[in-house]
Amino acid sequence: MSNYPKPINRLIEALSYLPGIGPKTAERLAFHIVSMDETKVNHLITALQDSRDKVFECSTCNNLTDKDPCTICQDESRDSNLICVVQDARDVTAIEKVQDFQGKYHVLQGVISPMEGIGPDDLNLKALMDRIQGEGITELVVATDPTVEGEATAMYLNKLVKPLGVRVTRLAYGLPMGGDLEYADEMTLQQAFEGRKEL
């Protein structure tokens, strides 16, 4: 244990709970916070508290929101027959930045991962099935990560939803813009070939 005062040690410990923050970074952040002026510290405290107390999952799509239903679910200009299925709320934000998708979302809150003990029953699939059957969904765009777990989840969704007459599509994956072909792995190249489009 360090010779720092107990409040600083507690702050370092609390900051190290955050993903990607090791002991040294937590220590640097703690000392930065201690040296900040009171207004900024109070703003940080309020932002942390509000994020924890006032942000919750939308009862329709499970996206993070501060009103229910969320603004995307309330937006009548969006195509309510089209749902993009994502792993978590950060994926919704990433897709929204592109400003190309005009449907609605459904956040699974994870992917099927037997290694981590996560099966279909651990995902938010019942609510998705209720939406498909109750809202007249015609297409499901599966936008899970291009990982073994993401692919397994996409295949499971396809098997689950296809019998209901819903079109199931998957985002195309492949080479990134500006990427060098020689550095691409085999799976990326394979998916790039499979997802090729006519010019």
Curated annotation (Swiss-Prot):
Citing just one GO molecular function, the answer is: DNA binding
Location of the Toprim domain: 81-176
Task: Give the source's domain of life in one word.
Answer: Bacteria
Asked if the Swiss-Prot or TrEMBL record annotates the protein with the keyword Transport, the reply is no
InterPro entries referenced in this protein's UniProt entry, alphabetically: DNA_Rcmb_RecR (IPR000093), Rcmb_RecR (IPR023627), Rcmb_RecR_Znf (IPR015967), TOPRIM_dom (IPR006171), TOPRIM_RecR (IPR034137)
Output the SUPFAM superfamilies linked to this UniProt entry: Recombination protein RecR (SSF111304)
Q: Give the UniProt keywords, A-Z.
A: DNA damage, DNA recombination, DNA repair, Metal-binding, Zinc, Zinc-finger
Q: Which GO terms describe its biological process?
A: DNA recombination; DNA repair
First and last residues of each zinc finger (C4-type): 58-73
**Annotated family:** Belongs to the RecR family.
> What's this chain's function?
May play a role in DNA repair. It seems to be involved in an RecBC-independent recombinational process of DNA repair. It may act with RecF and RecO.
Q: Entry's NCBIfam families?
A: recR (TIGR00615)
Q: Which PANTHER family match?
A: RECOMBINATION PROTEIN RECR
**What protein am I looking at?**
Recombination protein RecR
